[in-house]
């Protein structure tokens, strides 16, 4: 059911590539294709005689895209890859969740990241082919796609010399930012990105204009440093208000 909904409007065919007749159908489809995408285990297409390299030699205008867990080569290339494993190994799980334990992102973000990376690379290859007439070989892995998304935590750790702490819905470098409890146990999420928004929150919502110039909260850096104190003030105010009134 999920597969049908996600692939709505697409034409599909199911082939047994170990069957000679079905394999012939596959090769016939490839001969007429602009793009060949596969996510079999590294080396599988070589054994079948339809490696990306051999296909591009036979069809120079063909764009090929090999998707794997950890890349086509290297010590991890033969290992099975699952979304949860990649979330952990890339460090994503370590910056999600609560201060008590790591957390999994609630969607298959590694699969999605690899798909998006493949998509944009294929579009670039199509533009290039319009100019040169030649296809291109593309390799995408779940791990490298997600590792690229982890660039900011990496830079904060390596060059900022500080470990990124898990903060739930809070932001490591912005405050106030996160979910707060209102009257009747309703929840509201706010994200204050600049001093103008901070001033508006204090004067228009919290009705506490004196907080704007308070030394503890006079800059974003100070607000982050005194996050617990600030969150307590906001929760105390919001706790007496209905979400619709905020």
Which residues does each predicted region cover?
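Electropositive phosphate-/nucleotide-binding environments in soluble metabolic enzymes
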Residues: 20-23, 27, 103-106, 116, ...
